[in-house]
Amino acid sequence: MNKLLTIAIPTFNRAQLLDKQLTWLAKSIKGFESDCEIFISDNCSTDNTQEVIKKWQIILSNVKFTSNRNNKNIGVMGNIACCLKAPTSEYIWTIGDDDPIQERTLEYVLTTLKKHADLALMFLNFSGRQKRTGQLVVERWLNSDSDELRVDGKTVFQGYLNENFGGVLFISAAIYRTDLVQRALQKWPSATSNWASQAYWTAFCAAHGSVIITKDTYLECTMGASLLDLDPTWNFRMRYAFIPEVYIKLLKVGYPHKFCQKMIWQNFQQKTDFKILLGALKRWPFLTIKIFIPYLRFLSISAWAILFPPKQLDNSL
């Protein structure tokens, strides 16, 4: 019989953090062992990650606990996708190895999943703390005033995409219905090369069922901890390459044409947008041209989507 929930942890060369996260999980999972399974995807770590995994497999011997070690590093998004593809449980919760999670969270998640058998997506509200300074910079990331089950998942999530796109990129906050997120991976197999693909997976699930966005915060995002934060081109790539591509893909799963077009074209709404583009052109001319040409293609596709249904655009997408 399949488990209700898989708790999956993608990790790479952070054995100490993984050990700390599994310490939290060992406490939280008590009493719920029969509902859960644990999966660790090691992205070809060179530290003692494997020793940590084996240690906890012995400690948590009463829980189904499996792991995978990639033969080579397949990237952050590739390793997350590995976690999403592996489970056979009804739901999958992929958590970062460095994100602090409250002890009450797992119990709340399991209770809610049992209460709402048709749930497509649960998104846990969260706070944000800067790793370097330790300062709490965001007290509550998403503007949700209740834990109400919403059957209009697409409409609800469209509002969050418009209001706070960055918030939906936090992998540890999303609990997916497994069959839906695995369909999303099949629909867009190259999504692992897009740093914003988390938003697509989440929006895809929301478009195919009911959702819950919690009012209370249940975990904390460790900000400034990713290697991507050290890349000076990261914001430019997100703005002109990765996020626009996500909206093009969302056209195909039924998100409104005008909404997607608006979000793709928003990079030309203010004078500062042109300054960003010109600044990037001066700093990284070849990279900027390489990114901007496909962006122009996204602009044209979004414009044509107003006139033609998405099915007629499939060959272009």
Residue ranges and their predicted role:
Residues 1-238:
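Nucleotide-sugar donor-binding/catalytic module of glycosyltransferases
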Residues 169-174, 239-240, 260-270:
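A general structural signal for short secondary-structure boundary/capping elements
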Residues 217, 230-259, 280-290:
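Catalytic core of nucleotide-sugar-dependent glycosyltransferases
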